[in-house]
From Swiss-Prot:
Residues 258-317 bind DNA. Pfam families: Homeodomain. The gene is hoxd10a. One of its GO terms (molecular function) is RNA polymerase II cis-regulatory region sequence-specific DNA binding. This is Homeobox protein Hox-D10a. The keyword Transmembrane helix does not apply. It comes from Danio rerio (Zebrafish). One of its GO terms (cellular component) is nucleus. Residues 194-261 are annotated as: Disordered. It is found in: Nucleus.
Length: 332
């Protein structure tokens, strides 16, 4: 079929034109009146909406399927399908061969202007429907206009397009504003950090110049601590306790079950005491004083360590003796 490009009905079939025609032009008492300009438009809209079946061959009209009494909202449609009317569509044979539609096709396969009900047209179906799809109903268009009585007027479409453009541009503008605002928000912490660093440097540079006396006092305290460590042998004992608390993962400080051993002695001190215990389990007072000086422990600490070591040896020997006795016994 061919429409003149100048007429507005060539591209879209408008709702308001159909309503106005149905009220005034199409009906006069019981007879139907259709002008020559709107005759082709009416039959084209009825065919695309599924009200009239498609023509199978050129010049053939199925009179049984042309009965349109099912649609109660369009009266006197039987006269539209009269073959003697001048509104019959004559289409070329090569176009109508690809446009044969079965009666089982649902109305939902038509174009819809609502985004959630768009028809998903595949690449294989495009050439078959290309002859019936108007120019305004393109596949790639974001909103596909509805054929027939669902189409809106061009004035509404032109009025809606600026709003849609404004809505699409608004997210971009907001993103640009956010992008402009974020560098400021990010730059403020860096400026604050730089100010703090500069302030700390100033305070550090001013503090040595203002207070040279605390340095002298700290040196005196260090000297006193070294003298006290030489005079009193109990300080290494305390330092050994602190070092043990700092390193609880060492094997000689933890038991097999993971329990922390109560060991106030350093590893070097325990090794020296163990070597002396191998040579002699009982020490004289003179030898005990010598060992205490070499290991930086008091005489009493060395005495207690040897007592505990003898008790440990006694316990281990008892356990070994019991184990040997029980291993020789056989239970029947």
């Amino acid at each position: 079929m061919s429409f003149p490009n100048s007429s507005p009905a060539a591209n879209t079939f408008l709702v308001d034109s159909l309503i106005g025609a149905c009220r005034t032009d199409f009906y006069s008492s019981s007879n139907m009146y259709m002008p020559a300009a709107t005759a082709e438009m009416g039959t084209y809209g009825m065919q695309t909406c599924g009200l009239l079946p498609a023509l199978g061959k050129r010049g053939e009209v199925n009179h049984q399927n042309m009965d349109m009494t099912v649609h109660s909202y369009i009266p006197q449609t039987d006269t539209w399908a009269d073959p003697s009317r001048s509104c019959r569509l004559e289409q070329p044979l090569n176009q109508m061969s690809t446009c044969t539609f079965s009666q089982s096709i649902k109305e939902e396969t038509n174009c819809c202007m609502y985004s959630d009900k768009r028809a998903k047209v595949s690449s294989s179906e495009i050439p078959a429907y290309s002859s019936l799809i108007p120019e305004s109903c393109s596949v790639d268009s974001p909103e596909i206009p509805v054929p027939g009585y669902f189409r809106l007027s061009q004035t509404y479409a032109t009025a809606k397009n600026p709003d849609y453009d404004n809505e699409t541009m608004s997210p971009n503008t907001t993103l640009m504003q956010l992008n402009r605002a974020t560098p400021k928000a990010q730059s403020t912490p860096f400026v604050e950090v730089e100010k703090k660093l500069a302030h700390d440097r100033d305070t550090r540079s001013s503090s040595p110049a203002q207070s040279p006396e605390p340095k002298v006092s700290t040196l005196e305290e260090k000297n006193c601590s070294t003298e006290a460590s030489v005079s009193s042998p109990e300080l290494p004992h305390r330092e050994g306790k602190e070092s043990k608390n700092d390193t609880p993962t060492s094997n000689w400080l933890t038991a097999k079950s993971g329990r922390k051993k109560r060991c106030p002695y350093t590893k070097h001190q325990t090794l020296e005491l163990e070597k002396e215990f191998l040579f002699n389990m009982y020490l004289t007072r003179e030898r005990r004083l010598e060992i205490s000086k070499s290991v930086n422990l008091t005489d009493r600490q060395v005495k207690i360590w040897f007592q505990n070591r003898r008790m440990k040896l006694k316990k281990m020997s008892r356990e070994n003796r019991i184990r040997e006795l029980t291993s020789n016994l056989t239970f029947s």
